[in-house]
């Protein structure tokens, strides 16, 4: 696993009314600070949103509906996992929070129609000077297709 990337298992609290899942708390060891929360939805499966990286911003990703394949590439030259590539699948069926530190390129592909992701960022998005560098989805030689197993 890329250094500082975390996959946190979340525990649904279930009773006769339904369920509640705590996604992120200020007291969590993987929380740094709050900037903003936004919802991203993909209407059709196989929609790819990749790649970008931040210099300062931390991301916390939670799939609230459907499932997604995430690709992560460590671009931090001083990291012991520099250039390492990780693939992770996050799904509503096994609630998890994906923690992505600055300096790690990341992207995702929806695996189901109407996949929805709640994304929390440590910084407020600055439209005039965004903390992001974007590269094409086929960068790093990454293969987005789903392999038959």
Place the predicted regions along the sequence by residue.
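Short beta-strand His + acidic residue motifs that chelate non-heme Fe in jelly-roll/DSBH
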Residues: 98, 106-111
